[in-house]
From Swiss-Prot:
The gene is tsf. The keyword Membrane does not apply. It holds the Pfam family EF_TS. It comes from the Bacteria. NCBIfam families: tsf. This is Elongation factor Ts. Belongs to the EF-Ts family.
Amino acid sequence: MSEINISAAAVKELREKTGAGMMDCKKALIETSGNFEEAIDFLRKKGLAAAAKKAGRIASEGLTAAKVDGLTGVVIEVNSETDFVARNEQFQDLVKDIANLAVIAKTIDTLKTFKMQSGKSVEEEIIENIATIGENLTLRRMDILEISEGAIGSYVHNEVVPNLGKISVLVGLASNAKDKAKLEALAKQIAVHVAGNNPQSIDDSSLDQALVERERKVFFEKSKEEGKPDNIIAKMVEGRIRKFFSEVVLLQQNFLFEPKLTVAEVIKNAEKELGAEIKIAKFIRYELGEGIEHEEKNFADEVAAITQG
């Protein structure tokens, strides 16, 4: 193969086409006997092989995205290894394109198979971006919100560009209220509230009962240590559970924009104003990286990783 004459012009053209280094382009052309298309595939395979190594690294940065299309909304999270990549326009465009498809896809498994504008599947496009961006990227999760009538409010906190940021929230209000603008404004306000207050459920009945019992046990043991009589302990525990509900149950939280009222009271007032029943059908709140274990490294390991490339 070394006898094949590879022109500088061919190497330059391949470099411009692929963005690969000069020596890599020359090697690709030699390995493929000067076949330009095969040389591109050769470099792509090299890039994908490099991407496979990067895929083992922990990705806990990145972006969340919220997308609403009529009565359907979706939230996704795409992770990268560093916040620097989250500010990369190529990565932002990738997340936006995936969010647009997610509204139609409905499930994450289906979404991964959907074709993007490039003709590649979402999964393939992510792998290609791992190779070109140089970091592990993962489509971590998605959730969909659908209502038959009403309004969906969206809010993205710490936006880097519209609809992409660190926290993404959707709130679906089921209602046949005629004034859609006011209903949408209320849904938007509740979405902002959810971003800031991080409720765990819509109402107390839908709250994880194991969590409630765990809190009840903690309150009971704490009250017992204080040496209170059993009948007093029971009242104290119930009081503390009510306070717990007011902190984690959306309808019982004090509303961000009117702290003297609960979210339930704000909705009740809106029902009177709009002349229709309003129900929170569902909310979704994604905070970037929540639940991901961050890799612990000591200083020596970090220096070694940098020096070894």
